[in-house]
Amino acid sequence: MKIAQVIARVLDQGSRLSAVRLAKEHAVADVLGFTEGFNEDDLYGNLAWISENQGEIESRLFSFRAPSASRDIFLYDVTSSYLEGEDNYFSAYGYNRDGKKGKKQIVIGLLCDGNGDPVSVEVFPGNTQDMKTFFSQIQKVSERFGCERVTLVGDRPVYVRKEETTR
């Protein structure tokens, strides 16, 4: 199921429902051995599993990175995405980079290694300021990935008090 979802995202960056349709059109279910196919509920179940295991997945992927990847340089970017739906735990009104007024959004932080390969993604409430996402990334790199000296590179300056980085 996880491979089917990845294939669907590579072929067409649509919704989960479009992934089900794509699997029917391209025989992905048959190729991967899903004798009864799959539906949107199966994909949501898969996303729940990924969410529950995200930390372990990211840690394992980090440990298998290219040997040339630095353990002390990381690239970090923050963006937001507005939502049309009503029921999302993280949705809140906040600074919208797309200029969408009156829309709830989520804030997304993407952490990459020095080669630009993603190592972690984190979702924050939509009213979280960019600077407030920074400390959790330092903590993640230190505690989860075991890196001692870290330089985070972003697209604009983020000022963090020294005592916040030593917690």
Pin down the residues of each PLM region.
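Anion-binding and metal-coordination hotspots
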Residues: M1-R167
